[in-house]
């Protein structure tokens, strides 16, 4: 009898605490960018800020974030991830899947599809996404393609 009651009580408490923990949204920046740049700790085992404070890498992978989402969608996505406590967004500049020609904003990514001729408008958009992430305290783990 006591065992059954204990199990029920534990399950009930688990449900209560799990539900209440999901009510509060994160209100601050995801990471404290004022602590300096990131570097590998001298032990080689983890990342830290330049002031020596350990950095917790909680990443979300959005490979085609830059090329698929427009400005409004990007703002919503980054805000959603900031609220959830992510610290890093992993993405690429040039996606390899469907088309590499045009971004979601309708701008070409490359001039004449030539990798040696980046389109200035698209790369202004790339800079904007990175700046928006930084304003929210999110780091961007960026791959070229």
Predicted regions, residues:
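Active-site mouth of glycoside hydrolases
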Residues: 26-145
């Amino acid at each position: 009898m006591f065992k059954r009651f204990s199990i029920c009580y534990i399950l009930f408490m688990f449900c209560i605490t799990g539900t209440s923990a999901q009510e509060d949204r994160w209100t601050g920046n995801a990471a404290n960018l004022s602590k300096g740049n990131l570097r590998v700790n001298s032990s080689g085992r983890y990342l830290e800020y330049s002031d020596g404070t350990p950095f917790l890498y909680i990443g979300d992978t959005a490979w085609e974030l830059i090329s698929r989402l427009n400005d409004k969608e990007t703002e919503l996505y980054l805000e959603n991830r900031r609220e959830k406590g992510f610290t890093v967004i992993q993405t690429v500049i040039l996606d390899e899947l469907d088309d590499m020609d045009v971004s979601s904003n309708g701008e070409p990514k490359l001039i004449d599809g030539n990798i040696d001729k980046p389109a200035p408008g698209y790369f202004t958009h790339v800079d904007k996404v990175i700046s928006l992430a930084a304003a929210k305290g999110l780091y961007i783990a960026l791959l070229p393609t």
